[in-house]
Amino acid sequence: MPATAISAPKNIVLVHGGFVDGSGWQAVYQFLCKDGFAVSIVQNPINSLADDVRVTKRVIAAQSGPVILVGHSYGGVVITEAGNDPKVVGLVYIAAFAPDQGESVSSLIKDPPPGAPVPPILPPQDGYLLLDKAKFPASFAADVDLGAAEFMADSQVP
């Protein structure tokens, strides 16, 4: 079948990163819906990678047809794992981690290359991590409206 006869996937599944929920995708959601895409936003519990992959695969299963997975930050790890689903035809990483076999987010940020920004992760409290609110907009949501980035910083999910 010629490539021109294949229709582009219309299902896009957005996967948020750590520290936030799916509401950070609102502007992207509106833009894609306006262009005629069927967009779903995963609300991962951020308890474990296995749980997040399971929730993402549940959203993939609910789609009628091929799916493009889009992940931001830690969401890249999730889409890497969930991307082996037969419905998934593409992965899009937006400022996201794309670990190789055996790598984790921790191993990727442990020894950053010289000059690379270091995530402003605060010391754990009760076993949970948060980003420094003052540094959140520049480090996590640099291309987001400042008001939206500040809201995301104040509504972080540990």
Residue map of PLM features:
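Conserved alpha/beta-hydrolase catalytic His-Asp/Glu region
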Residues: 128-158
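Glycine-rich His-Gly loop
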Residues: 15-18, 72-73, 96
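Short glycine/proline-enriched coil/turn segments at helix->beta-strand junctions
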Residues: 35-37, 62-66, 84-89, 157
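Glycine-rich FAD cofactor-binding loop and adjacent beta-loop-alpha segment at the N-terminus
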Residues: 56, 70, 91
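Flexible "cap/lid" loop of the alpha/beta hydrolase fold
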Residues: 84-133
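Active-site catalytic motif of lipid deacylating hydrolases and related acyltransferases
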Residues: 5-65
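Gly/Ala-rich beta-loop-alpha elbow adjacent to hydrolase catalytic centers
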Residues: 70-75, 79
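Active-site signature of alpha/beta-hydrolase-fold catalytic machinery across serine-
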Residues: 27, 81-82
